[in-house]
A protein has these predicted regions:
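Active-site-proximal cap/lid insertion segments
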Residues: 1, 6-13, 18-159, 172-175, ...
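C-terminal cap/loop subdomain of S1 sulfatases and analogous C-terminal strand-loop tails that border
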Residues: 119-125, 166, 171-234
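Generic preference for hydrophobic/aromatic residues in regular secondary structure cores
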Residues: 43-45, 50, 160, 201-207, ...
Length: 234
């Protein structure tokens, strides 16, 4: 409601709105009907690999001691996943309500909307819950959905980064991206124009860099906190 009020008050004026929703996040809880929308007994649990942890980097072993997924019962884990799905559906409905508000105000064809998340969740994968310093796909592969004037509806497979968001916004505002910014504007690729392929992207969590190689089949990350740099596989 406050986001729509903000837009309504600035009708006819350029505006920038950062609409932040804290969910899905711990504690895993939401309201009805979302809390019972996904029956826990219908949900599959991620596979558990016996003795998986002993070959992982030291940083991941430390995180596991704090956020142990294997210490959570299957029933509890299903409850967590059920609520996580419910929270995401709640967000989906709220974002839909906001987009409908833009349409009512006549702004849907003149507004750039960017939907993004900062990280994913383990939800039991790799015997972990919540998040950690490891660069697994379930944590770093986040949604980046953009609706913009003249954008071509498509699914983009090329490697992009959250640092591309700011240059993209500047491009649509008709502003130059500072030379010190590493990100690239996604405006060309949204218009189905040429976009140079990336060889790499940077990522960091809690001050711990993770070199990450991804050939689209076997992502491998290495932790600088591991004495033997043991690889962590997807």
């Amino acid at each position: 409601d406050r986001a729509l009020d903000f837009v309504h008050e600035r009708a006819g004026q350029p505006f920038f709105l950062w609409y932040s929703i804290p969910d899905p996040h711990i504690p895993f809880q939401t309201c009805e009907p979302y809390s019972s929308m996904y029956p826990p007994d219908d949900l599959e649990l991620p596979p558990r690999v016996e003795n998986e942890l002993h070959r992982k980097p030291q940083a991941q072993q430390i995180d596991h001691a704090v956020m142990r997924g294997d210490a959570v019962s299957d029933a509890t884990l299903r409850d967590i996943i059920s609520l996580y799905y419910g929270m995401n559906t709640f967000i989906d409905d709220e974002v839909g309500r906001f987009l409908s508000g833009l349409t009512r105000l006549g702004l849907d064809d003149d507004t750039v909307v960017i939907y993004v998340s900062d990280h994913g969740e383990y939800l039991g994968e790799h015997q972990m819950i919540r998040k950690s310093k490891a660069a697994y796909d379930c944590l770093i592969h986040v949604p980046l959905i953009i609706r913009a004037p003249n954008a071509v509806q498509q699914e983009i497979e090329t490697m992009v980064s959250l640092e591309d968001i700011m240059p993209t916004i500047l491009s649509y505002a008709g502003l130059e991206t500072p030379a010190t910014v590493h990100g690239r504007s996604l405006m060309p690729i949204l218009a189905d124009e040429s976009f140079p392929e990336r060889d790499y992207v940077y990522g960091e969590y809690g001050g711990h860099p993770h070199p990450l190689a991804d050939d689209q089949t076997y992502p491998v990350c290495k932790s600088p906190l591991s004495s033997d740099f043991s690889p962590t596989m997807k």
